[in-house]
């Protein structure tokens, strides 16, 4: 077996074990709201939370073959969140993900849709989403993406609710699009997450939106793209950013968002203050301050988030797992083969050792919200 095949098997297995992520909760004005924990799927009477439920218990994705189907809206067979988190227009919400694999690089995008009534009963296929936040390629020279910023910010992302939108009930659609297999048609992996918010105050804007089933096409330049080449720019998928969105509203490690649908590579920024472990939910701000927060929900999500790993394997192109669409095509296989064959035996062994160490010994809980 060739070096490339051996490395592909090892790193592909690592991707399967590491899994993907989902939004476990949100922090608003110092208060923690549980999202939909995957363990709730097996409960006869799960807690009422702001996060929409989903059948994606394998932490899987939606690919381009389902862009016209309802699953792309809020994930597979998603059902409405039962309650809403109240937030004033102009305020920030911190969205907390479970551990996200570094190999799954791509943009982070956030939308809102006015429910025009109760979000607990709204028909998701009728929701019209307008984009309030986006970030894509950070640096083409070292292949740094918005997802890397999210990881370095303790797997969290902060979004500002536009101050100009009208008060009302909104569904937030927050999403990472993983591009590690996107060199192949339908290889991009969408991980949409939906949460309910009651927006207070604000202005009078009621932005026009786009149905969730019309947000993307599988041939969009930001969807069908080879990220294993040096990119000088990247076009973020989806409709244009809402004009009332705050510039710099999002925060991975840099705390800025692109101001147009097309994002151009810029210098990578440093990470925020290092996270700490507590027995309660913790809001990680983009400054040195770390604030304790209270927990809302009949049962807090029993989710733990992995601290950023130093694994070299996670930052290199990995062989797609069995869940990845189009992983066997010649395009991505050639890219991976060239990369692995360029490594010396010692370098390859080091990549494998660090991957196994990350999987077995280095996993720690960066947040504990199960107090």
UniProtKB/Swiss-Prot annotation:
Binds 1 copper ion per subunit. Induction: Expression is up-regulated on steam-exploded bagasse as carbon source compared to glucose. Lignocellulose is the most abundant polymeric composite on Earth and is a recalcitrant but promising renewable substrate for industrial biotechnology applications. Together with cellobiose dehydrogenases (CDHs) an enzymatic system capable of oxidative cellulose cleavage is formed, which increases the efficiency of cellulases and put LPMOs at focus of biofuel research. Residues 304-332 are annotated as: Disordered. GO terms for molecular function: metal ion binding; monooxygenase activity. Its EC number is 1.14.99.56. Residues 307-332 have a biased composition (Low complexity). Belongs to the polysaccharide monooxygenase AA9 family. Lytic polysaccharide monooxygenase (LPMO) that depolymerizes crystalline and amorphous polysaccharides via the oxidation of scissile alpha- or beta-(1-4)-glycosidic bonds, yielding C1 and C4 oxidation products. Catalysis by LPMOs requires the reduction of the active-site copper from Cu(II) to Cu(I) by a reducing agent and H(2)O(2) or O(2) as a cosubstrate. In addition to cellulose, also cleaves the beta-(1!4)-glucan backbone of tamarind xyloglucan, irrespective of substitutions which contrasts with AA9A xyloglucan cleavage activity. This is AA9 family lytic polysaccharide monooxygenase B. It comes from Aspergillus tamarii.
